[in-house]
Every structure is written in structure tokens, then in C-alpha cells.
Amino acid sequence: MKRIRQSIAALEKAVLAGGDGVSEDVKFHRAIADAARNPFLIGTLEYLGQFLQGATRVTRANEARRADFARQVADEHEHIFQAIEAGDVAAARRSAARHMDNAIKRIEQADPSFWQEEGMKLAHPLVTSLHPGA
């Protein structure tokens, strides 16, 4: 629990200092997987790690452009933490699913200028790693 809480604090600190918070965000998700002691979840995160860093870079850049998005993410992380801390597996699962669903919605609601500017640059390495030759 301590690592999860520390990762939330580190993420907030990084963003307040003007950083993108990508590394800290990925560490938050890894801390949850480690706390769950679920080998499948840990293995999946390790495998997806090659894509997770790039995807998180895209989502964090989009969220940094809008205070409402940034606040939503912070609130979602806090809800996940609180559910885990309370030992409420169902609430943790719902909170995590909501976080993933909302991440997709935030990308869908990204300002078109995001994709014309940094979004496309950030997403390109991710797309080419998934679809070589793209």
C-alpha cells in the first residue's frame, strides 16, 4: 500500500514540477500489480510494458492540456487506491475499469490540435511498433 500511495504522491509532484509524469504513472500501475501478487497481472504488465510507456506518454500529454482531464485522472487513481486499501476487490475492479474506459474517452475527446501537434509525434513510435511499416 505504501508503494501505491508513494507513486500517487510522486506523480502529483512530477506534474506540479512541470514534468509529464509518465514514469510515475507507469510505476503507479506496477505498484498495484505487485501489491495484488497476481503473477498473471505482473506478467501481463511486464509484457505490455513496451507499449504501456508509449501509450501513457500519449495519454498524459493529452491530459496535461486540460485541467479537467488531469483532475479526473488524479481522482481515478485515488479511487483505485482507496478501494485497494479498503480491501474491496469489487470496487477496485470497478474503479480500474472506469479508469481505463475514461482514458479511452479522454483520447476520443482530445482537441484536434493535439493530434496535429504533439499527439501524432508521441503516438507514431507506438503505432510503428505495433504495425511495422506504418
Q: What residue ranges belong to the model's regions?
A:
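Conserved amphipathic alpha-helical segments that form helical-bundle/coiled-coil interaction surfaces
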Residues: 1-61, 76-82, 91-106, 110
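Short alpha-helical linear motifs
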Residues: 25-29, 66-73, 114-122
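Short C-terminal domain-edge/linker segments immediately following a structured domain
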Residues: 63-65, 76, 124-126
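Low-complexity, flexible helical/coil segments
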Residues: 69-70, 78-83, 117-120, 129-130
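Interdomain hinge/lid region at the active-site interface
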Residues: 74, 86
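C-terminal effector-binding regulatory domain of bacterial HTH transcription factors
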Residues: 89-134
